[in-house]
Amino acid sequence: MKALVKTSKAPGLELMDVDIPEIGANDVLIKVKATSICGSDIHIFKSSPGYMRSVTIPTIIGHETCGEVVEVGTCVTSLKKGDLVSPEPLIFCGECYYCKMGAAHHCQNREILGVSINGTFAEYARMPARGCWKHPKDISSDLGAIYEPLGVAVHGVLADEVNGKSVAVFGCGPLGLFAIGAARVFGATRVFALEVASKRIAMARQLFPDVTVINPREQDAIKAIMEATDGLGVDVSIEISGSAEALRQAFKVLKHEGRVSLVGVPSRPIELDTHPDIIRKEARVLGVLGHVIWKTLWQVRALLDTGKFDPLPVITHRFPMAEFEKAFALATSGEAGKIMLYP
């Protein structure tokens, strides 16, 4: 089968012929229908030092996927051939302290799909059956593939109460747009969105006409938000961009006793003035790691079932897997939404 493989620590990927994986008694074999490019895939493509420490060489990358079960292990009873599934990227053991405490996303023995073990930029992928989310039969492959990143955004939004709150989302890439949509549906009274890339600004304004979109390079974002909130600031800041300046702004515009959700991963350590921005404000700072297995995906399903947010327009480009170089060049430009690859 064809697969996108990270073959060295150098930047880039290779499209290679590899064997179709053999499954164990508790596994399923998935015929991949669609996979979207994640920010972590971009870091692996670029060989960003902070990510490469965790990458096994060689490894098939990719994890945001929808596929059809075509083979079932002898001990699997929860899935059958023909089921449409998305894999949970964090392969959890089910036996460690955190797994048994209901926090499998913190598994002490975890493997990461497309990072430490083979992923889903391929024609077929092997997954433990317990790590598959089963979709309704009528779901589109594209929607199934973005279920997991939707989960990351929803986890960032719902890490604490958002209903009746004002929210600022920092970064209007795919996760940021998902977070804006989720915040609106789950009851945010007013949403601000901050972004510097012109195409992403245009997309945010087109998708969410009622959201106040601010370009911090063109106006004083802190002043604009404080004036719009009677000098109080927002109840919730959700930082998704990973930008050091955006992170500082997220605290500056925060109301006293407000909440900051940290979703984006900075490329370097960031210095904060904790006294005025955290201690005096009694700010609550919540790190967001992926999503809560499986609670968050039920929340994603609830979000979609409302019919009030369609995430598919966030997908802006689609490529066959053979054109991966073009797709990743576009993804690294910061001028696209979600990008899909098809085997």
Task: Map each language-model feature to its residues.
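Adenosine-nucleotide cofactor-binding segment
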Residues: V169-F170, R184-Q249
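C-terminal hydrophobic helical "lid"/dimerization subdomain
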Residues: K31, R248-K252, W294-P343
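NAD(P)H dinucleotide-binding glycine-rich loop of Rossmann-like/cofactor-binding domains
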Residues: C93-F170
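N-terminal glycine-rich cofactor-binding segment
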Residues: V5-E22, G39-E71, S86, H106-S116
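Residues at the starts of beta-strands that form the adenosine-phosphate
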Residues: K2, S166, T189-V191, R259, ...
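N-terminal Rossmann-fold NAD(P) dinucleotide-binding loop
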Residues: G176-L177
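Glycine-rich beta-strand-centered segment in the early N-terminal region that forms part
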Residues: P21-T35, G50-Y97, P136-D138
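Glycine-rich phosphate-binding loop and adjacent beta-alpha segment
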Residues: Q206, S243-T306, P343
